[in-house]
Curated annotation (Swiss-Prot):
Keyword field contains Transport: yes
Signal peptide range in chain numbering: none
GO molecular function, one term: iron ion binding
Listed SUPFAM superfamilies: Hemerythrin-like (SSF47188)
Family listed: Belongs to the hemerythrin family.
Role summary: Hemerythrin is a respiratory protein in blood cells of certain marine worms. The oxygen-binding site in each chain contains two iron atoms.
Protein name: Hemerythrin subunit 1
Length: 114
């Protein structure tokens, strides 16, 4: 079972990881998915892909620097999301659900550890 999808689809404090840079990047991802859901076009998809790649890299660097034990599992989830974006089929509901559940399950595991 997943977490409720916010409507409107915006970041709220329930997604806070307490790492300012990560929270700011998560806000950008929410915005990117919101815009893609409103207008599924190549530009919006490209911008979401760019922001996602940057965020995942930044998060992974933080995890590696702190020798976070859940790094491999976390990176695998990131890789799967990127694969889905690279083979985009226009399912913005899938992207919305993935981000909400990823933050609240996978990302929350590193709170206070990286």
């Amino acid at each position: 079972m997943g977490f409720p999808i916010p409507d409107p689809y915006v970041w709220d404090p329930s997604f806070r990881t307490f790492y300012t840079a990560i929270d700011d990047e998560h806000k950008t991802l929410f915005d990117g998915i919101f815009h893609l859901a409103r207008d599924d076009n190549k530009d919006n998809l490209g911008e979401l892909r760019r922001c996602t790649g940057k965020h995942f890299l930044n998060e992974q660097v933080m995890m590696q620097a702190s020798q976070y034990a859940g790094y491999d599992e976390h990176k695998k989830a990131h890789d799967e999301f990127i694969h889905q974006l690279d083979h985009w089929k226009g399912d913005s509901n899938w992207a919305k659900t993935w981000l909400v559940n990823h933050i609240k399950t996978i990302d929350f595991k590193y709170k206070g550890k990286i």
